[in-house]
């Protein structure tokens, strides 16, 4: 290999490392919001419940995030909304489940309004 090839390969490798670490910086609460948004977009109750469970898992994990400040009141209210979304989704009531997931998103966004990220 010549020097230009080695330099090009090294540059690509460094860019790949930095871009993958940038992707990994989403907080658990950010991921909870993403899954709740997917729940709202789902058409079937079971799918809403599935995404809501994933959202709830990340929301609970966010309680251990040390990098950001989270308003626990809104976080807990969002988790309660997800519980409703899961229950309604499991019962096949997609519309009510979507509404509850929408409420969860609102609570999670309020929980992060005064964060440092």
Predicted regions and their residues:
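Classic N-terminal secretory signal peptides
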Residues: 1-24
